[in-house]
């Protein structure tokens, strides 16, 4: 029986029937992806295999168009409803825009913004949507240039009259992109990042709920850059996280994203669409649109570990890097052996921001001698800023000014909600 990767087949073995799409398989075997999301493998000579059309009926070559070929699929219906708020969906790729590629068995970014809209019909009741593909990549391939291209596209959509923006994005580096846009754009409307932990063809996919909740936030009064993702492992509500205070805290759970050193801005109830807020936020229209691009890519995070060779800092200084984020222990400490190397970096006009590996809590280098020595060497306390956010902030600040003293001053300011005045327990 002839079949190829991507074909739908019915397999019978010992009276049990299995259906699914053919995946890459070893010679003499067939592996299928079943509707449940699980894979099943069989020895070809021990099963009966029947090719199926997409509707599950056995293929006979007579109802699929000329010469047994499938008729072209009808054009996707545009999801649009005039009179509702105008929301632009900008797709960059990631799991929310992914499905299984049956040529390789891997998850690939194959959907566009319009595909997402067509796949989730509930969206058309919320807003009048416009889809725009910015890229189709997994988020590990995003970089500072990608952030700036995305930011420009967001600004263009707002200037064109969008009442809200949704950015579909891979979850692994979504916090970096959200932070980058938080620093680059002052926005009068919501800019909502959303993704999913599980691809659209898996029964446990979180893409639909996350997208629907993101749409609710995109038409809300919350005019900030935010991340909207599952609040629990159940399909009950999503949390709204400030773009500079959010972090992915689990590799695969649907509720992987958490606000750190802050409460979420609020929650969105999946069933009712009700938004509850917990902390102050910038309201719709409170700020005029401002766009300040510019990112210095030659910045890095250095994680201190016991016994680590401090000369690694010299590698960055001699390599022409412009700024460093140190992940210190506890309150923000490194070994005393690192102090001269920090001083050399600062003397080379390289800002050095200190954050904590603890994530929760605030850096305070005025308690112990080592911390005081770090400050004397010129290190900058990152307060309660996340290391990843500190890196993006550093890149953005150095993209705005070449003056060392001005950069140091800006890095100590709360520019986009990345620093809280008081530490949250």
Swiss-Prot record:
Database matches in InterPro entries? AsnA_fam, Asp/glu_Ase-like_sf, Asparaginase/glutaminase-like, Asparaginase/glutaminase_AS1, Asparaginase/glutaminase_AS2, Asparaginase_C, GatD, GatD_N
Q: Name one GO biological process term.
A: regulation of translational fidelity
* Example of a GO MF term: asparaginase activity
Documented EC number(s): 6.3.5.-
Q: Catalysed reaction(s)?
A: L-glutamyl-tRNA(Gln) + L-glutamine + ATP + H2O = L-glutaminyl-tRNA(Gln) + L-glutamate + ADP + phosphate + H(+)
User: What does UniProt list as catalytic?
Assistant: 95, 171-172, 248
Renumbered residue ranges of the record's region Disordered:
53-84
What is the similarity comment for this entry? Belongs to the asparaginase 1 family. GatD subfamily.
- Subunit arrangement? Heterodimer of GatD and GatE.
Q: Which PANTHER family match?
A: 60 KDA LYSOPHOSPHOLIPASE (PTHR11707:SF28), L-ASPARAGINASE (PTHR11707)
This chain's protein is named Glutamyl-tRNA(Gln) amidotransferase subunit D
Taxonomy, top ranks, is: Archaea, Methanobacteriati, Methanobacteriota, Stenosarchaea group, Methanomicrobia
């Amino acid at each position: 029986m002839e079949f190829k990767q991507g074909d739908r087949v019915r397999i019978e073995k010992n009276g049990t029937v299995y259906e699914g799409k053919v995946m890459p398989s070893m010679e003499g075997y067939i592996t299928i992806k079943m509707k449940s999301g699980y894979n099943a493998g069989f020895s070809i000579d021990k099963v009966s295999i029947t090719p199926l059309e997409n509707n599950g009926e056995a293929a006979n070559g007579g109802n699929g168009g000329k010469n047994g070929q499938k008729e072209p699929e009808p054009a996707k219906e545009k999801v649009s409803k005039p009179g509702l708020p105008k929301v632009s969906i900008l797709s960059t790729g990631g799991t929310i825009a992914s499905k299984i590629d049956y040529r390789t068995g891997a998850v690939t970014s194959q959907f566009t913004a319009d595909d997402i809209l067509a796949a989730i019909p509930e969206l058309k009741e919320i807003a009048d949507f416009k889809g725009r593909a910015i890229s189709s990549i997994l988020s590990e391939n995003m970089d500072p240039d990608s952030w700036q291209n995305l930011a420009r596209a967001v600004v263009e959509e707002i200037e064109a009259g969008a009442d809200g923006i949704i950015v579909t994005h891979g979850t692994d580096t979504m916090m970096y992109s959200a932070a980058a846009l938080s620093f680059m754009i002052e926005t009068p409307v919501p800019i909502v990042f959303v993704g999913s932990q599980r691809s659209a063809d898996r029964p446990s996919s979180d893409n639909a709920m996350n997208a629907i909740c993101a749409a609710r936030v995109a038409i809300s009064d919350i005019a900030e850059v935010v991340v909207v993702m599952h609040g629990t492992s159940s399909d009950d509500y999503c949390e709204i996280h400030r773009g500079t205070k959010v972090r992915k805290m689990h590799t695969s759970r649907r509720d992987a994203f958490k606000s750190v050193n802050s409460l979420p801005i609020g929650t969105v109830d999946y069933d009712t669409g009700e938004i509850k807020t917990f902390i102050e936020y910038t309201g719709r229209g409170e700020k005029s649109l401002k766009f300040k691009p510019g990112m210095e890519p030659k910045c890095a995070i250095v994680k201190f570990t016991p016994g680590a060779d401090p000369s690694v800092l010299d590698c960055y200084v001699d390599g022409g890097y412009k700024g460093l984020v140190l992940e210190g222990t506890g309150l923000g400490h490194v070994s005393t052996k690192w102090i001269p190397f920090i001083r050399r970096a600062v003397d080379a006009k390289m800002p050095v921001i200190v954050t904590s590996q603890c994530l929760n809590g605030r850096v305070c280098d005025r308690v112990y001698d080592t911390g005081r020595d770090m400050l004397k060497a010129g290190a900058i306390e990152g307060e309660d800023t996340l290391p990843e956010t500190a890196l993006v902030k550093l890149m953005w600040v150095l993209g705005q000014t070449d003056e060392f003293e001005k950069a140091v001053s800006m890095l100590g300011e709360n520019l986009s909600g990345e620093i809280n005045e008081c530490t949250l327990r």
